From Swiss-Prot:
Name of the protein in its database record: ATP synthase subunit alpha
Membrane topology: Peripheral membrane protein
Oligomer and partners: F-type ATPases have 2 components, CF(1) - the catalytic core - and CF(0) - the membrane proton channel. CF(1) has five subunits: alpha(3), beta(3), gamma(1), delta(1), epsilon(1). CF(0) has three main subunits: a(1), b(2) and c(9-12). The alpha and beta chains form an alternating ring which encloses part of the gamma chain. CF(1) is attached to CF(0) by a central stalk formed by the gamma and epsilon chains, while a peripheral stalk is formed by the delta and b chains.
Known function: Produces ATP from ADP in the presence of a proton gradient across the membrane. The alpha chain is a regulatory subunit.
Keywords per UniProt: ATP synthesis, ATP-binding, Cell inner membrane, Cell membrane, CF(1), Hydrogen ion transport, Ion transport, Membrane, Nucleotide-binding, Translocase, Transport
Pfam families in the record: ATP-synt_ab, ATP-synt_ab_C, ATP-synt_ab_N
E.C. numbers: 7.1.2.2
Residues binding ATP: G171, D172, R173, Q174, T175, G176, K177, T178
Lineage of origin: Bacteria, Pseudomonadati, Pseudomonadota, Alphaproteobacteria, Rickettsiales
Amino acid sequence: MSLDVNASEVLRIIKEKIKDFDQQIFSEEIGEVISVKDGVVIACGLENAEFNEKVVFPNGEIGLIQSIEYDHVGIVILTNTQDIKEGDTVRRTKEALRIPVGKKLLGRVIDPLGNPLDGAGQIFADAYSPIEVKAPGILDRQSVKEPLQTGIKVIDLLIPIGRGQRELIIGDRQTGKTTIALDSIINQRDINKNLPDEKKLYCVYVAIGQKCSTVARIMKTLQEQGAMDYTTIVLAGASDSAQSQFLAPYAGCSIGEYFRDNGMHCLIVYDDLSKHAVAYRQMSLLLRRPPGREAYPGDVFYIHSRLLERAAKMSDKHGAGSLTALPIIETQAGDVSAYIPTNVISITDGQIFLETELFNKGVKPAVNVGLSVSRVGSAAQIKAIKQVARSIKLELAQYREMEAFAQFGADLDETTQALLEKGKKLTELLKQNQHETLPVEEQVVLMFAANEGYFDNIDVTGISTAAKNLLGSFRLYHRDLLEDIKEKSIIGDLASLSSALQGCKTTNA
């Protein structure tokens, strides 16, 4: 029996059969865990792995590739390491580590992976951003030109900070470094009050290797001061792994960059980068990288430079947003010439140097005006401050120098005695209690009064009270002059200000 085969019919049947065939082919690169030790996994088989790539283990644990050798890769574990064992598979994701960013994170405390730590529920973020982002290029930036008011007299008047600047806060332990950073955050409360959302300054506080009790106290302070509404805290505590502490500042920076890249403004505090360098050293030694000076790896400068270069004032073409960084470095016995301090000093745009000796004398904030500098902030300083604070830094530096000679008990001429007396009064005038920030217009009035000789006949011990009384009188009777300075950023009517000052002098005498 013959069978007629119609070729076209067969072709039609085959076409119909494969028409709805939609089998997709997935390619995966899977490696095998060779060893697990101290939060570091050595794996083989990931031949095309990339540096800083996210990898996933069977139970959902996340790792980050931090070392690529000829026949294996080094992976740091970012989650629980207990469930990972020798022989487990590890899978490439071909993507970078991403974290949630946006306004939904304001008022929250999170870990470096974006998980909430405050018990206030899940975070539904506006967007996700990679932790590692390339810093803006030269053409994407513009020079710093807007002031960032900290509310701290000695900083706003003598060591001004501009939006988009990197200003280092450096000093020994217990000298008030964190207090300066917190006061800078708290001062934005009143500034933000009457501004639209896109003009407000948002804040990110990154706690690296801090005790959880310390961070809880910081959070409570910010809540009491009404500052948590515009602040996010990123916490990698002292009990967290070295890799978590290493990632924390990069995660915080990505959160800050969301505001910067959307035409808004953000202030980020890294507290502190000394502990960050120690965490990176620990991680690098576990990855068998060769140690260098003080056992830090050779690229320890790069980990801080690539982080701090992400702070910038963006060009008008890119929205004119800004990210201002206040990194903190803890020194040992005032040694600013150590490895990490000199690295960060060379990266930043200036430093605020805090001294134990001044702190112990009761000068708070304990800022050494002679050693502190702001390399770009003066361009952002408002004209009113330039009018009153031009000579103060020099006078204070001369006072510190003369004070050393005066201790020898030598007979001093009248000019030197006058310089010492004025220096003491200026130092007293610049003292400030923590969390008692001053608006810029009131700082201008105080310095104008000092220049006009308002405090000349007042004893050093009475300077603080006299300054409070003066500001109280201005708030009560001369609010219009304060508002004029605030709005115009310049002392427009010198005669009226001098007249008001004389009136206060008579009233408070």
